[in-house]
Each structure stands twice: as structure tokens, then as C-alpha cells.
Regions:
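Short, charged alpha-helical interaction segments and adjacent helix-coil junctions
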Residues: 13-18, 112-166
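Pocket-edge structural micro-motifs
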Residues: 64-67, 102-103, 142
Length: 166
């Protein structure tokens, strides 16, 4: 799952599903933080044409939907913006945000539909109109032979990654 969309206010979003907390075997470090940085850079490069002013860059969000708790703190959501280390009240205001959505979370306030989405991701439980729409769309896509084949291959890869992650 990798989705890039923009809303009516020209805010751009890159959403990606993460089923495994990968480490780089050479450095023994987790890849998700650097992947976030890379995706922010890709969004900016795509959104700003050569010669355009930097202040034309729209707000961007890189959102990882994780089926694991990257920080092991139990939050439903971890949101990051750039802040001054010497004075945490100062925000850089570059309008670049990274969010890690933790489908296994237990702490914090989230919208009911987001919680339903987490339940759907974790257990394929349809318990709201929102998750019913998602489930219906997936069912429809499975009917298309080409999409169905790609979906089955993706599901097999996700299953393999989940097994490796356990």
C-alpha cells in the first residue's frame, strides 16, 4: 500500500502500510526514520518545479500505518515536526509532518473511524460504515482478474513479512 493524494487545500499526503519493522543488517538500525526523511524529500522534489520559489511548497504529511509499535510506548499516533532543541516551543514551520499510526496502540485520543480502521487492519473486523466501505472496495477489486492476481501476490508478500516479523 502506497498512496499519494492531495486534499482541496493542496496539502499532500503519502500513506504507506508497514507490516514489518525492518533493520538494515549492515548498520543494525531501523530503516523507518530514514524512509520517512526520504519520502518527505521525494514529495518536495515532485511538488516544486525547477526555478520555483521554496515558499510555494505545500504542506506535506508522510504517514506510516504500522502494525507494530515502533516506539513501544502504546500511543495510537506518533506525530513529528521539526523543533528547536534549545527551545522546544520553537517550531521550524516547514509544514512537513511525519506520522506513525500504531494499529496496536492503546493510548491517546483518536477518532472512532480511525479506531475502526485499526481493528480492520489488525483483524479484518468490519465494525463501521468507514471500514465497510474499505472492505467493499477491496472485495470489488478482488473481482477484477488482473487486480485480483496483484492483490494475491501482495497478500502473500505481506504474510511472509508478518511471519518474518514475529
Amino acid at each position: 500500500l502506497d498512496i499519494i493524494v492531495a486534499d482541496d487545500k493542496n496539502t499532500h499526503y503519502n500513506l504507506e502500510m508497514q507490516v514489518k519493522n525492518n533493520k538494515n543488517p549492515d548498520t543494525d538500525t531501523y530503516v523507518l526514520p530514514k524512509r520517512s526523511r526520504y519520502y518527505q524529500a521525494l514529495l518536495d522534489i515532485d511538488l516544486l518545479q525547477q526555478g520555483q520559489e521554496y515558499d510555494l511548497l505545500p504542506p506535506t504529511y508522510v504517514i506510516f500505518i504500522c502494525v507494530f509499535d515502533f516506539f513501544a510506548k502504546g500511543n495510537y499516533v506518533y506525530t513529528f515536526k521539526k523543533r528547536c532543541l534549545e527551545n522546544l516551543e520553537l517550531e521550524l514551520q516547514d509544514e512537513a509532518t511525519t506520522m506513525l499510526l500504531n494499529t496496536k496502540g492503546t493510548h491517546g485520543d483518536i477518532f472512532k473511524d480511525i479506531k475502526s480502521f485499526y481493528d480492520y487492519v489488525n483483524n479484518h473486523i468490519v465494525n463501521s460504515d468507514f471500514t465497510k466501505q474499505i472492505d467493499d472496495e477491496i472485495s470489488y477489486l478482488k473481482l477484477d482478474t488482473k487486480v485480483r492476481r496483484e492483490y494475491m501476490l501482495m497478500e502473500a508478500r505481506l504474510l511472509d513479512e508478518r511471519r518474518e516479523g514475529e
